[in-house]
Design a protein with these regions (language model features):
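Active-site-proximal N-terminal segment of extracellular/periplasmic enzymes that hydrolyze or transfer
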Residues: 1-41, 45-47
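Short catalytic/ligand-binding loop motif for oxyanion handling, primarily in non-cytosolic enzymes
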Residues: 14-18, 49-57, 66
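Acidic, metal-coordinating catalytic cores used for nucleic-acid/nucleotide bond scission
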Residues: 47-49, 73
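Catalytic-site neighborhoods of secreted/periplasmic enzymes
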Residues: 56-91
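Generic alpha-helix structural propensity
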Residues: 25-28, 52-53, 75, 79
């Protein structure tokens, strides 16, 4: 049986507000996800806009490769979701 994959992308969250010693937000569910899941502390966005950045993430390519310049996600062949489907995951 394959492990579940839960992909959570948080837009406009400040790490200092919901984690660490200076935490000022009450986020029990995010706290639980971070404790029991895989947490990446050093992720870097591919672009300054949400849609362009998500498009880069889902296609595993930088924006200049995908040609994304608008507010629409365009999935190329062999994208993140295709890879999951090809490996038996249900999307």
């Amino acid at each position: 049986m394959q492990p579940n994959i839960f992909f959570l992308d948080l837009d406009s969250f400040r790490a200092d507000k919901f984690m660490g010693v200076s935490k000022s937000s009450i986020t029990p569910n995010i706290d639980r996800l971070m404790k029991n899941g895989t947490y990446f502390s050093q992720s870097i966005t591919a672009a300054d806009g949400t849609i362009i950045s998500l498009n880069a993430t889902f296609n595993s390519q930088f924006p200049f490769r995908t040609g994304t310049r608008s507010e629409k996600i365009i999935l190329k062949d062999n994208n993140y979701f295709d890879i999951l489907k090809n490996n038996g995951y249900h999307i």
